[in-house]
Amino acid sequence: RLYDYVSMGIDTFILECEYSFYAPYYYSLEDIKTICQQYPQCHFYVALNALYDEHDIETLKNYIDELSKLSIYGIIFEDFGVLQIVKDKQYSFDMMYAPETLNTNAMTLNVLKEQGVTSAQIARVIPLEEQLLIQQQVNMPLMLQVHGVEYIAASKRALLSNYQKASGLEFDKESQTRLTIQARNSDYAFHIYEDQKGTHIFSFTRLYMLDLLNQIHHFDYLYIETLMMSEEEAVEVASLYSDALKSFENHTYDRDVKAYMRLLYQLKTPLTRGFLFVQTVYKLE
């Protein structure tokens, strides 16, 4: 269904592969090659966003060699070993540094630019005010997640399998949306699932910024996380943001945004502002 997104005017995509840490879909090298050939007008990033063990390094190097033969625009990474491999090979990928929670200040990102990082994803766990401040002070392209479930935690351990063995309970631990966990005396539930990479925990609610384009339009990339979405929901959400961006460019966004929000609410998915308007508190001792 990539055609659906391209026809909306969306031109940048993240493709997950066998070396990605979590994903709604995993694409083979042949799949990635075919996609790049079918949509030469688009930019494709490949997510190599795990923290890799030493025994993975040689095969990872070989995989990056294969990516260099394709029309891949960039690599999304978390492990600096990936950046070092690319630098040693002198490949020309855009190297987007995207740890889940670490990109929280401009100074660090400007230093990392000197080390070969060429773009970055801003952490979701800081207020919008701070995200905007970083965008103003960083001298590289930045990506901001604007919609979808939010990463909470992950482990390379098979935590659900271990719990299953200890408890004797039977449940589908591999379904991305079937299991939820909720701490005692807490109002917040989270999705949890397990795959061959480990255990993953994500928010039950979906972050949304459809009505905040006046504030976030200066970011270079606005990212929609489609993990745990049906194909229909993913297309509908992407269409709403695509239409909203066109409306913004045509100077009709302020008039149209209420209609877009009504359509978003009709999807009947749980929505949240995440940390966008939560103030950061510093305790000084």
What is each PLM-predicted segment?
Residues 105-107:
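Conserved nucleotide-cofactor-binding alpha/beta core module
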